[in-house]
Amino acid sequence: MERNLNSLLKWSIENSVPSSAPAANGTNGTNGTTAVTTHSSDSNNTSTTPADAPSQTNGTSAAAANSKLNPEILSALFGGPSEAELMKAAMEVLTDKSATLDNQLIAFDNFEQLIESLDNANNLEPLKLWAPLLGLLAHDEAEMRRMAAWCVGTAVQNNARTQERLLAEGGLPILVGLATKEGEDVAVRRKAIYALSSAVRNCQPAMDAATAELSAHGKGDKVDAGDMDAVDGVIEWLRGEGERCVNGVKTFYDVGIGYQRRREERG
């Protein structure tokens, strides 16, 4: 809010009309502007024009040169909801068990767009939105889990502060669990891996927490979070594990279908 007020003050100063200057030598005492007298061929016909009158030929108004108010400042000025309030409102819909899935997915889409802003992502902590967001990773609906993982990945991408917060909130084990869980929806796995990739890069504590969880899956070697090739190796391994699980489920399904068809053929 303070930032918006400062921006509003700056805008008002830039767009204010300067007061008339006091009369001085060479100025018209009534309006404080220098007068230029022009003479036509008729010696009795003279006209006086302010020297600082705006040009009619440059085609650019003074207002166009002034800075504009961004939507957030306009919302604050006219009483609209702030982005922080929109984030809280979206989370209320996401955690409302009476809300329809369609409305919750719309709220998730809006929430994800809001936290693309670094300031809004950082506000997840003071707004106490981390806990409910991570809680949605365990939602019954796969699409809700997918969107929750997507939002986590967006919030921590290239942001040391939110990476640390995710670690403190216990989000790393949850994401590793989603990325490695047998039978998990493919789209959910992919977004969980995306979130892990964003969470561990250049954040050694998060990388250590992730590899500690992955040790149960045979991938617990120490990895330098600043070595992008090494981090990519872990992420690619996770993707490979996901594909292996998907292929395993598909094979099991194909075998089952084949068995059923053979039984039908035998009559």
Curated annotation (Swiss-Prot):
The keyword Cytoplasm applies. Residues 23-49 have a biased composition (Low complexity). Transmembrane segments: none annotated. GO terms for biological process: regulation of translation. ARM repeats lie at residues 58-99, 118-157, 160-201. It holds the Pfam family Fes1. The keyword Repeat applies. Residues 17-63 are annotated as: Disordered. Signal peptide: none annotated. PANTHER family: HSP70-BINDING PROTEIN 1, PROTEIN FOLDING REGULATOR. Functions as a nucleotide exchange factor (NEF) for Hsp70 chaperones which accelerates the release of ADP. Required for fully efficient Hsp70-mediated folding of proteins. This is Hsp70 nucleotide exchange factor FES1. It comes from Chaetomium globosum (strain ATCC 6205 / CBS 148.51 / DSM 1962 / NBRC 6347 / NRRL 1970) (Soil fungus). The gene is FES1.
